[in-house]
Amino acid sequence: MIFKQLFEPESSTYTYLIGCRDTGRAVLIDPVRETIDRDLAALRELDLTLQYTLETHIHADHITSAARLRSLTGCKVAYPEMDGLACADVAVSEISPLDVGGVRLQPLFTPGHTDAHHAYLVDIPGAPHIFTGD
């Protein structure tokens, strides 16, 4: 697995880039509009193709770059199914994990920050990672 944590200082939010070394496919979790050029540069630098953007929740503190990334790269936009967004290409839930090449992201319903908030578990043997958003 390829992993990169990216920080956006204006909104104090993190974007996570996760990639599969074997397939060259990647996902950006919680991408931010103001940092789209940085994110695209990171994908190029790592020789990755963006397969998905994935949100932990609908954000009030920043604007997602998901739609713009979809138009630039052809990636699919994934959101928690409970959000019921018509603009999402893929709906994820605890029973619908997201596979990015050989990397599986398991959605975990974690209400609190928002009513439909989800975290994502990448269960790498010996080194599990969980991405919680904000």
Describe these PLM feature segments:
Residues 1-48, 120-133:
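Conserved beta-strand hairpin/beta-sheet module of binuclear metal-dependent hydrolase folds
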Residues 12, 33-109, 128:
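Active-site HxH/HxHxD metal-binding segment of metal-dependent hydrolases
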Residues 18, 30, 57, 69, ...:
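Divalent metal-coordination and catalytic microenvironments
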Residues 64-65, 118-120:
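Active-site-flanking alpha-helical
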Residues 102, 114, 122-124:
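Generic secondary-structure microfeatures
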